[in-house]
Amino acid sequence: MVKVPGKPEDYSEAMLKSFLTLADVMATGYHAARVADVKPGDTVVVMGDGAVGLSAIIAAKLRGAKRIISTSRHNDRRELAAEFGATDNVAERGDEAVEKILAMTNGGADAVLECVGTAQSTDTAMKVGRPGAIVGRVGLPHDATMDMATPFYRNTAVAGGPASVTTYDKDLLLKAVLDGKINPGKVFTKTFTLDEINDAYQAMADRQVIKSYVKVSD
């Protein structure tokens, strides 16, 4: 949980939605950027266009990345990625994505934020960083196996895991929301009542929404 100053009625609905992300997706996206050591001027690739991937774009920009490459195939998510700070987008997958990103970045990105967890996404993430890059992996692994030869020969470091939420990122992200620097609440693209919670989960599973917002009461 993240303690917010004041009372709920002190804030707009949009601000409350942004606060809500600090206990989950925004903290996870920031964790990816932090463990990948994203620095001012860096080129960053973000694997994933869900709420965590979009939050990772916000985090990369917040940490000063100069170029941020999103990887979306969906117009609404690509547009939101651009609004959050993505400068480019690659819709291709697999070897085509690797080839395009390496060409765009003159040999690879400084950091790669893997926010999906599938074998294909992880494999791509290991191949699109420059030699010596860091992959920040926060996508929940769908497969226990991972090719370690590629990162070994490219001197690529891999770091990540569950976000801390209440340690190094808590005050930084809360201040960024309060100051209006970031607006991660935009990942909530549809509101549901508590009675509709099953529909809310299904809508995310069917990719009809980016993130469902369940409003318990008025």
Located regions from the model:
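Adenosine-nucleotide cofactor-binding segment
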Residues: 46-49, 61-124
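C-terminal hydrophobic helical "lid"/dimerization subdomain
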Residues: 107, 119, 123-127, 167-218
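ADP-ribose/adenylate-binding Rossmann-like module
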Residues: 129-144, 158-159
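Rossmann-fold NAD(P)-binding glycine/threonine-rich loop
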Residues: 139-154, 170-173
